[in-house]
């Protein structure tokens, strides 16, 4: 496997291999620091990122690769060059891998079809997919809960605009998770692989093993679909009182960035979540993915 565009690209063997590598990198941050020596990886992020870009850069450099992040603001795109031409020119320089984030759904898949010999990782495209975040979340849940099968997983928030929700649903449902969506009617959608849709947070997280919170993606909301952030937080913010309706050993997750006071209270974020563990797992997972795509040998 040389390209990762969406969760469906992954076989069960791929996922198991990436999980095993991830846990090894999670437990030993100094593992295999020269395994990608001589490899050239280019990061092209046409949309803002903190965790995904930083974790990829750390993973690349930790494994010995030459890591190049193109500054979009100073690139020739500002001189009128198209994004496709920019990527074509980067590909002509013969890097081993290009990691792309785009605000346009399915755009990265079109790039892959246009440049079939180019190895690409999708680092998030519009509201379509975010496969490396789904792998991070899969590894986090499995690390803590040991098994995905029959877990009650509630994904709460702006489902309509979330690529993280879509990738997680596609991945976790393959392993027997019972997935519920919790969102206002205007931010919900019926996706393959879910068990229930709720519009009440307490009902939606009752008996949950995992709660995955999502922020309001204001940059993608074209028309006003909620009365106000204040009303949204009153109805859908996870606080300590609402959290009591989930299982006692529930894990609270969030892919970031968090908007504390809107979808999650400060108290829950600081004391009851595994958000920072997810961030650490994200570096390990991206090391594992790079290892698997570019080296593809066991440790």
Curated annotation (Swiss-Prot):
List the PROSITE patterns hit by this protein, alphabetically.
CARBAMOYLTRANSFERASE (PS00097)
Keywords assigned by UniProt, alphabetized = Pyrimidine biosynthesis, Transferase
One CC-aspect GO term: cytosol
Pathway given for this chain reads:
Pyrimidine metabolism; UMP biosynthesis via de novo pathway; (S)-dihydroorotate from bicarbonate: step 2/3
Q: Which InterPro entries match?
A: Asp/Orn_carbamoyltranf_P-bd, Asp/Orn_carbamoylTrfase, Asp/Orn_carbamoylTrfase_sf, Asp_carbamoyltransf, Asp_carbamoyltransf_Asp/Orn-bd
**Organism domain of life:** Bacteria
GO biological process entries: 'de novo' pyrimidine nucleobase biosynthetic process; 'de novo' UMP biosynthetic process; amino acid metabolic process
Which sites bind L-aspartate?
79, 163, 215
- Signal sequence span per UniProt? none
Indicate yes or no for the key word Transferase. yes
Catalyzed reaction equations? carbamoyl phosphate + L-aspartate = N-carbamoyl-L-aspartate + phosphate + H(+)
Binding site residues for carbamoyl phosphate: 51-52, 101, 130, 133, 256-257
Enzyme Commission number(s) of this protein: 2.1.3.2
What molecular function does GO assign, one term?
aspartate carbamoyltransferase activity
Function, as annotated, reads:
Catalyzes the condensation of carbamoyl phosphate and aspartate to form carbamoyl aspartate and inorganic phosphate, the committed step in the de novo pyrimidine nucleotide biosynthesis pathway.
What does the annotation say about its assembly with partners? Heterododecamer (2C3:3R2) of six catalytic PyrB chains organized as two trimers (C3), and six regulatory PyrI chains organized as three dimers (R2).
Q: Which family does it belong to?
A: Belongs to the aspartate/ornithine carbamoyltransferase superfamily. ATCase family.
Q: What is this protein called?
A: Aspartate carbamoyltransferase catalytic subunit
Name of encoding gene: pyrB
